[in-house]
């Protein structure tokens, strides 16, 4: 087993999940995104099979947090909203020395190998 003792202990002390049944009589009542529900709760799973449940109130709280209002630190400034547009750089011609070097390189073709099955 790869789970640590504290992880195993947390699994054994899991709280019962409160569920509620919503009857949908018309396909129009189905949400646009199938991982969400009519009540606004989002359900997801990890590749390992862990079920994630995000309630609507929790997600709305995250939306207004200061962390969600700040942009990531590694985004170029030209992609940030509200920055003035800068013109694209004009294409600079390739130096002739570089063209001569690439022409002088000779790529030798090798015969295709046989694969025995």
UniProtKB/Swiss-Prot annotation:
Induction description: Up-regulated in response to bacterial infection. Expression is induced by foxo: in neurons, foxo-dependent expression is activated in response to insulin signaling, while in muscle foxo-dependent expression is activated in response to fasting.
Post-translational modification: Phosphorylation at Thr-37, Thr-46, Ser-65 and Thr-70, corresponding to the hyperphosphorylated form, impairs its ability to prevent the interaction between eIF4G1 and eIF4E1, without affecting its interaction with free eIF4E1. Phosphorylated in rtesponse to insulin. Phosphorylation at Thr-46 is regulated by Tor and constitutes the major phosphorylation event that regulates activity.
Motif (YXXXXLphi motif): 54-60
Impact reported for residue 54 to E/F: Abolished interaction with eIF4E1
Keywords per UniProt: Immunity, Innate immunity, Phosphoprotein, Protein synthesis inhibitor, Translation regulation
Pfam families reported in the protein's UniProt record: eIF_4EBP (PF05456)
InterPro entries attached to this UniProt entry: EIF4EBP
Superkingdom assignment: Eukaryota
Residues in coiled coil: none
Phosphothreonine sites (modified residues): 37, 46, 70
Phenotype of the disrupted gene, per the record: Impaired innate immune response.
Signal sequence range: none
Effect of residue 37 to A: Decreased phosphorylation in response
A Gene Ontology term for the protein's cellular component: cytosol
An example Gene Ontology molecular-function term: eukaryotic initiation factor 4E binding
Modified sites of kind Phosphoserine: 65
Tissue expression profile of the protein: Widely expressed.
GO biological process entries: antibacterial humoral response; cellular response to insulin stimulus; cellular response to oxidative stress; immune response; innate immune response; insulin receptor signaling pathway; negative regulation of cell size; negative regulation of eukaryotic translation initiation factor 4F complex assembly
Role this protein plays: Repressor of translation initiation that regulates eIF4E1 activity by preventing its assembly into the eIF4F complex. Hypophosphorylated form competes with eIF4G1 and strongly binds to eIF4E1, leading to repress translation. In contrast, hyperphosphorylated form dissociates from eIF4E1, allowing interaction between eIF4G1 and eIF4E1, leading to initiation of translation. Acts as a regulator of various biological processes, such as innate immunity, cell growth or synaptic transmission. Acts downstream of phosphoinositide-3-kinase (PI3K) to regulate cell growth.
Quaternary assembly: Hypophosphorylated Thor/4E-BP competes with eIF4G1 to interact with eIF4E1; insulin stimulated Akt1 or Tor phosphorylation of Thor/4E-BP causes dissociation of the complex allowing eIF4G1 to bind and consequent initiation of translation.
Family listed: Belongs to the eIF4E-binding protein family.
Domain commentary: The YXXXXLphi motif mediates interaction with eIF4E1. Compared to other members of the family this YXXXXLphi is atypical and interaction with eIF4E1 is weaker.
Name of this chain's protein: Eukaryotic translation initiation factor 4E-binding protein
UniProt gene name: Thor
